[in-house]
Structure formats: structure tokens, C-alpha cells
């Protein structure tokens, strides 16, 4: 069971979740896009997920399109269609389309195409100016291996300057242009300007040339792929990012790094991460750079390792997000790496911490090539070093390359789906009743976990058939709003349901909101223990 396997936008999301993903995995990797589609940010698009094949569902979606809205992109593997609205279309028109299209039996969800933003001692001459490889104990690992070029790390980010003096030796030459471009769709992920530097910096941290007498030392000498999903302005649409993740997995990437976030929960992006995880990729992502905020997506998905940032003194960076999803910490403050054009600079952010973990994962797999992605994930956790921070700040601890490479994984444990396991018999059920109308359009609730070892929770709403009420949920106790939430269910009518897996660190915030009509409702929370 996975904490984020399906977002419960409607009851059929719960009923069809497993079969839908099975359909995704069995389809060919065919995508199509309309020429002239917006680059990078795609704020005028709505993404519609389907349970059947895209080709079979396209006519249904076409029939729901309002005037001047068009299908501009499809992805058969992940099972979604992108619909573009005119820029002057009202918010109400977009919301009405979402609700209308959700009436179709073969439609699973509809969501905005949100924007995510860019988050032995070697002989490299700038190694003395670095601290990140030393902090994560790379020198002990380098006595065993510098990394196997047969292990591939895909960087879903801005483009990488693949002919950079300190990167070209580690770029994966088995793929045309060492990657692909999902922003311009021209097949070449090369940066368009010197200011498009985030991807080159991230790639250099994970797998810049090490012990090559040039530039700085990357964490590993594994192979790099560039999956350009963020434009030169630093932003990218969820569909471009989802396509890049799927493509990376289809290329056989062992590790996928995502130093990006900020767009909120997306079912499309969740499906892409789950697809890649099931293909055998280890996914690593930046926790986010808004200290005090919860871990951003995609790092917060169960299929992804969320990484927080440490400064040189192994204290939590002032910008690093934190929360129960954090699995590992790594250096992210003032990290030296490559930038265009054959230059070097120091950047700060969880965007820098994430590729440190990705690089360590790469050469851990070089030393222990038989590990599955789940076993590799567990091994990185088990060999991490406690630096005295809370679990919400450091997760299992600071990643340690030396320990990960030199420690025998044994039988590896792990395996299977993330968060697998079944809930037990312990149950706690709470109910509340209320009435909402134009004079009282919403009610807010909070729920504190009650079972000894929480496993899952289902929040359900039952209201009048003549009204339309919606249900919003947060997992950190903050009061949800219609624009700030972690889960949402919004069918026609007033019967809604949201199910979530629990780690034990959550506190539920609940909002019952009037979309139209009025009347009484019953809210039920059922919590299951392990």
C-alpha cells in the first residue's frame, strides 16, 4: 500500500486505482503534442487521467470540451490527456470542465497542469574548495570504487551542458544527445543560455568527473542522462516533468534525481513516480527551500526519497523544508559544482543536497550491483549517520558514502512496494455532523491519530443529493482551504471520500466546503492501526 498511490478526487479513484496503474504499465510509451504548445509553464492546461487507454477515452474527453478548448498532448504510458483552454477562459469555466469530465466512467481525475520550479583523495584541482564529498565520507568509498559507468543517473531538471569539460566523460553516450528535451521537444537537452545553469550544477554534483585532473569532484563517476523538463527560466509543467520521469525509467535509469518542486500534489506526477519505481528506478528529490513548510512534491510521494539540506557544520540549512517524509540529509549549502560554459560556482538549496544522495546511490549500486531499488533505498537509510537532528530534519541521518559502499547489505531486507504491509484489526472511528449553507459555507475539523501504530485513515462525507459539497484534507494539522490542501475529493453531489496511508506523524486537518446548495452532512473518520 502506498501513501500517495491515488489522489481521491472521486469515489471511482478509490475503486479503480489498482487496475488503472496496471493499464499504465502495460501500454506503449507513445506521447503526442500539438505544434505550438506552450513551452515550460502551461498554466492554461488541465490534465485528465483515464483508466482505459488514451485512444479509447479521447472521444469521451472531446465530447466534454467547451468551445475553443483543445487536446494538446497525450501520454499513453501514464494514461493522461492535456487540455488547453484560452488564456482568457474563466476559472469557473475550467472548474466546470473538471466536474463535467469526471462524470465519464473512464476518467479518473482532472487537475491543473501546475508549474514546478528548480530546487582515495581525487586529483581534481578545485577539490580543496569543496566540502560536500568530504562531509558524506566519499574518500572511504573512493578507495573501493569511483562509480560504475554502467550505472545511470538521470537528472530531471534544466538541460545539462553535456560537453562541459568536467561532465562530458560521464555523459551516457548510448542515448542520442545524452538525453531528451521535454520543453522544446527538439530532442536536444542542451541549455539555451548561460543562465540555464541549474541542471548542469545538479548533474555535476551527482556525477561530475572525479579523479580526472579537471575542475571539481562529483560524488560518483556513474553515467549521466539529461532529461530537460525545466526551461531556462527555471520552471516546468507537471506534464513535461512526468514525461521526463517516464522516459528516464524507460531508458533504464538506475537513479532519477529531481531537484524541483513547489507545484503541490499531482496525480499525474504521482503516477509517473510510481511507474518509474515499479520499473526499478530509485527516485530522489529535494525536500524544498521554504523552512517551516512541509516537504514539497515530488519529494513527499512514498515512491521518492526526500532529502533535506545540511550546512558545512552539519546543521540543518536555514532554508530546508522538514517533515515526516524526510529520509536522508545531505550537504546543500554553498556546494561547488559545474555551470555553463565550462565554469564552476557554488549554489545553495535542497536542490544541491538531492544529487549528493543520488550520486551516493549510484556508486553504492556500483559496489553492490544486485540490490533492487527498494533494497538500495533501505541500505542508504541503514548506513546513514545520525548528526543529532530530529527525524523530521534528518530522516534516518546524513547519507554516508563510505558506510554505504563498504557495509555488506546482507540480505538487503526491503523489496516490494514502498510502504507495503497490511493494516491490522485496531480501529478508531469518529463522526461529526454539521450544516452548511450560503451563510455558513464551510466547516473545519482536526483529528489527532489514536491507534497505537497508525496504518491508514479514510475520511468520508455524506450529504444531501440536492447539494454539492467538497472535502479537503491536510496531513500536518493546518486548516485546509480550497487552494491549500494535501488531498481533495470533489464529485458532483455531496458524497466524498479520501483515503491515506499513515506513518504515525500526521495530524489531519479537514474542511467540508459548499460548492452549491445547502443542507446537513455527516463526516466520518475511520483510522486503522497496523
Swiss-Prot record:
Residues making up the signal peptide according to the UniProt record = 1-27
Q: How does activity depend on temperature?
A: Thermostable. Highly active at 75-80 degrees Celsius.
The alphabetized list of GO BP terms reads: proteolysis
Name all Peptidase S8 domain ranges.
126-405
Q: Where is this region: Disordered?
A: 390-447
**Which compartments is it annotated to reside in?**
Secreted
Sorted alphabetically, the Gene Ontology cellular component annotations on this record are: extracellular region
Q: What InterPro entries does the record tag this protein with?
A: Peptidase_S8/S53_dom, Peptidase_S8/S53_dom_sf, Peptidase_S8_His-AS, Peptidase_S8_Ser-AS, Peptidase_S8_subtilisin-like, Peptidase_S8_subtilisin-rel, TAT_signal, Thermitase-like_dom
Q: Which UniProt keywords apply?
A: Hydrolase, Protease, Secreted, Serine protease, Signal, Zymogen
Which residue stretches does the UniProt record annotate as biased composition, category Polar residues? Answer: 429-447
Q: How is it modified after translation?
A: Predicted to be exported by the Tat system. The position of the signal peptide cleavage has not been experimentally proven.
Q: Under which EC number(s) is this enzyme classified?
A: 3.4.21.-
Q: Does the keyword Secreted apply?
A: yes
Active site residues of this protein: 157, 198, 351
Which regions are flagged for Gly residues bias?
Answer: 410-422
Q: Which family does it belong to?
A: Belongs to the peptidase S8 family.
Protein name as annotated: Halolysin
Q: Please tell me the species this chain comes from.
A: Natrialba asiatica (strain ATCC 700177 / DSM 12278 / JCM 9576 / FERM P-10747 / NBRC 102637 / 172P1)
| High-level lineage | Archaea, Methanobacteriati, Methanobacteriota, Stenosarchaea group, Halobacteria
Amino acid at each position: 500500500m502506498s501513501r500517495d498511490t491515488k489522489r481521491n478526487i472521486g469515489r471511482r479513484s478509490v475503486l479503480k486505482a489498482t487496475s488503472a496503474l496496471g493499464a499504465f504499465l502495460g501500454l506503449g510509451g507513445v506521447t503526442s503534442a500539438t505544434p505550438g504548445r506552450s513551452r515550460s509553464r502551461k498554466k492554461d492546461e488541465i490534465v485528465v487521467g483515464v483508466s482505459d487507454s488514451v485512444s479509447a477515452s479521447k472521444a469521451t474527453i472531446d465530447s466534454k470540451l467547451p468551445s475553443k478548448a483543445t487536446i494538446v498532448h497525450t501520454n499513453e504510458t501514464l494514461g493522461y490527456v492535456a487540455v488547453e483552454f484560452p488564456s482568457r477562459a474563466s476559472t469557473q469555466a475550467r472548474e466546470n470542465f473538471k466536474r463535467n469530465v469526471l462524470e465519464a466512467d473512464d476518467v479518473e481525475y482532472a487537475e491543473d497542469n501546475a508549474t514546478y520550479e528548480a530546487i582515495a583523495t581525487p586529483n581534481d584541482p578545485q577539490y580543496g574548495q569543496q566540502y560536500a564529498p568530504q562531509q558524506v565520507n566519499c574518500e572511504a568509498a573512493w578507495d573501493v570504487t569511483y562509480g560504475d559507468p554502467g550505472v545511470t543517473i538521470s537528472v530531471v531538471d534544466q538541460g545539462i551542458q553535456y560537453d562541459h569539460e568536467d561532465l562530458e566523460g560521464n555523459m551516457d553516450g548510448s542515448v542520442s544527445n545524452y538525453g531528451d528535451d521535454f520543453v522544446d521537444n527538439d530532442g536536444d537537452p542542451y541549455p539555451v543560455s548561460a543562465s540555464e545553469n541549474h541542471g548542469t550544477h545538479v548533474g555535476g554534483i551527482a556525477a561530475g568527473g572525479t579523479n580526472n585532473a579537471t575542475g571539481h569532484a562529483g560524488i560518483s563517476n556513474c553515467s549521466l542522462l539529461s532529461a530537460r523538463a525545466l526551461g531556462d527560466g527555471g520552471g516546468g509543467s507537471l506534464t513535461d516533468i512526468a514525461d521526463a520521469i517516464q522516459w528516464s525509467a524507460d531508458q533504464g535509469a538506475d537513479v532519477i534525481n529531481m531537484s524541483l518542486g513547489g507545484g503541490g500534489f499531482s496525480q499525474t506526477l504521482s503516477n509517473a513516480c510510481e511507474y518509474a519505481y515499479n520499473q526499478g528506478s530509485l527516485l530522489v528529490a529535494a525536500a524544498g527551500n521554504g523552512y517551516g513548510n512541509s516537504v514539497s512534491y515530488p519529494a513527499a510521494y512514498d515512491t521518492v526519497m526526500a532529502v533535506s539540506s545540511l550546512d558545512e557544520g552539519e546543521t540543518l540549512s536555514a532554508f530546508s523544508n522538514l517533515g515526516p517524509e524526510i529520509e536522508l540529509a545531505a550537504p546543500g549549502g554553498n556546494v561547488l559544482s559545474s555551470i555553463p560554459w565550462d565554469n564552476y560556482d557554488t549554489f545553495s538549496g535542497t536542490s544541491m543536497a538531492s544529487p549528493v544522495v543520488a550520486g551516493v546511490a549510484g556508486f553504492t549500486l556500483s559496489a553492490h550491483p544486485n540490490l533492487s531499488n527498494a533494497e538500495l533505498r533501505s541500505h542508504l537509510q541503514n548506513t546513514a549517520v545520525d548528526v543529532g537532528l530530529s527525524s523530521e530534519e534528518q530522516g534516518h541521518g546524513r547519507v554516508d558514502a563510505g558506510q554505504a559502499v563498504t557495509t555488506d547489505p546482507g540480505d538487503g531486507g526491503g523489496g516490494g512496494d514502498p510502504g507495503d504491509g497490511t493494516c491490522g484489526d485496531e480501529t478508531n472511528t469518529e463522526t461529526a455532523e454539521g450544516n452548511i449553507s450560503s451563510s455558513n459555507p464551510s466547516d473545519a475539523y482536526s483529528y489527532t491519530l489514536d491507534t497505537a501504530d497508525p496504518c491508514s485513515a479514510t475520511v468520508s462525507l455524506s450529504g444531501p443529493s440536492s447539494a454539492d459539497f467538497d472535502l479537503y484534507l491536510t496531513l500536518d494539522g493546518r486548516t485546509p482551504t480550497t487552494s491549500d490542501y494535501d488531498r481533495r475529493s470533489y464529485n458532483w453531489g455531496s458524497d466524498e471520500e479520501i483515503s491515506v496511508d499513515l506513518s504515525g506523524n500526521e495530524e489531519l486537518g479537514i474542511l467540508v466546503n459548499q460548492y452549491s446548495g445547502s443542507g446537513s452532512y455527516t463526516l466520518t473518520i475511520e483510522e486503522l492501526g497496523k
